[in-house]
Amino acid sequence: MSPSDDPISSIFFERQQAALCAQHALNMLLQDSLFTYENLRDLARQMDQMEHDILGNNANAVGRSENMNDSGFFSIQVIEKALETFDLKLINMENPAMAEFKANPLTARAYVLNLREHWFVLRKFGNQWFELNSVKNGPKLLTDTYVKEYLHQFAAENYSIFVVQGILPNSEADDFITLCPVVPKPTDFDKKEPNLVQKFFNSVGRRLGGSQEIPDSQEDRDLAIAMALSMESKESSESSGSDEDQLAKAIEMSLSQDPNIPSTSAAPSELTETPILGPSTSSETPSGRIPSAEQQRRDRAKFLEKLEEEKKSQNVPEE
């Protein structure tokens, strides 16, 4: 493979056949076509026999397997047995011994995941993470931020997440992507991404007086997209409150979660009520629209001033 080729094409990938996701997940994890259905079937039968010998009459009836089914699904025990040949182990992420990886998922080299009898893999090549899922069209590049969010979401949705322990066999993809990282390709979502990023940073810049430029860092872009989507969700789901109030809440949440977003020393309540004024002393924004929070503050001030004047006029002694 030459450097002119797309680096992602160096990743070994298998498309789904029947329910052989365990076979595909193993081969994609190891980056070679090492296991067949027959291999895993034989392992499953060996394990069934061992269980029968140990449990005796308490074992399942002969012919019924707990380690495979007719569609091609294989249990975690079969996958673990297959990986023993390569001195690799799978340990559930909820195991206390895996606390390091739960706190910082990026320190692992790969994960094997299962939900409702479907197996797939998250694996690192070079310094980049990829989802290897046999029901997809090919490897999917993931940013570090997305890997963390994926695993967090998977855990919330009751996926079984296993940390791959041991040294994975080196592959062509490891070497190639280390030298030539994969460049993300535009997708339908990417067409919307610039608008989402610009929306968030325009909002932050306008409200906080900071820069409205789109950041170069992919991590910052990912965070901006997430916050913009959050803002869109709030706008569509909440019928009460103005758009400006919802935007202020989203910005306040983002500031409390990420210290890298430009901020001021003002308290959150000040950020939502204090307008960002330019050189002009006009009380209106360039668009001629007064922010609702500021309008409310000014209305209160005018009311209090009027009330104070009325009190003073009532206290003036008659001549």
Curated annotation (Swiss-Prot):
Q: Which reaction does it catalyse?
A: Thiol-dependent hydrolysis of ester, thioester, amide, peptide and isopeptide bonds formed by the C-terminal Gly of ubiquitin (a 76-residue protein attached to proteins as an intracellular targeting signal)
* Keywords from the UniProt entry: Cytoplasm, Hydrolase, Nucleus, Protease, Repeat, Thiol protease, Transcription, Transcription regulation, Ubl conjugation pathway
Subcellular compartments: Cytoplasm; Nucleus; Nucleus, Nucleolus
Write down the InterPro entries for this protein, in alphabetical order: Ataxin-3, Josephin, UIM_dom
Q: Which domain of life is it from?
A: Eukaryota
According to its UniProt record, where is this protein mainly located? cytoplasm
Task: Indicate the segments forming the Josephin domain, all copies.
Answer: 8-179
Under the GO molecular function aspect, what terms does this record hold? cysteine-type deubiquitinase activity
What are the GO cellular component annotations? cytoplasm; nucleolus; nucleus; synapse
- Basic and acidic residues: compositionally biased ranges: 295-313
Please give a single GO biological process term from the UniProt record.
Answer: positive regulation of ERAD pathway
Q: What residue stretches are annotated with the UIM domain?
A: 218-237, 242-261
For the region Interaction with cdc-48.1 and cdc-48.2, give the residue spans.
297-300
Region ranges (Disordered): 253-319
Which ranges does the record mark as transmembrane? none
- Give the enzyme's EC designation: 3.4.19.12
Q: Where is the active site?
A: C21 (nucleophile), H118 (proton acceptor), N133
Broad EC category: hydrolase
Q: Where is the composition biased (Polar residues)?
A: 254-267
Q: Any signal peptide, and if so, which residues?
A: none
One Pfam family named in its UniProt record: Josephin
Q: How does it assemble?
A: Forms a complex composed of deubiquitinating enzyme atx-3, adapter ubxn-5 and cdc-48.1. Forms a complex composed of deubiquitinating enzyme atx-3, E4 ubiquitin-protein ligase ufd-2 and cdc-48.1. Interacts (via RRDR motif) with cdc-48.1 (via N-terminus) and cdc-48.2 (via N-terminus); the interaction with cdc-48.1 is not required for atx-3 enzymatic activity. Interacts (via C-terminus) with ubxn-5. May interact with ned-8.
The record describes the protein's role as: Acts as a chain editing deubiquitinating enzyme that binds and cleaves 'Lys-48'-linked polyubiquitin chains, with a preference for chains containing four or more ubiquitin molecules thereby modulating protein degradation by the ubiquitin-proteasome pathway. Probably by regulating the IGF-1-insulin-like pathway, regulates lifespan. Regulates germline DNA double-strand-break repair and apoptosis in response to DNA damage by recruiting E4 ubiquitin-protein ligase ufd-2 to DNA repair foci. Interacts with key regulators of transcription and represses transcription.
For this protein, the record's PANTHER family field holds:
ATAXIN-3-RELATED (PTHR14159:SF0)
Give the protein's recorded name. Answer: Ataxin-3 homolog
Q: What is the lineage of its organism?
A: Eukaryota, Metazoa, Ecdysozoa, Nematoda, Chromadorea
Gene of origin? Answer: atx-3
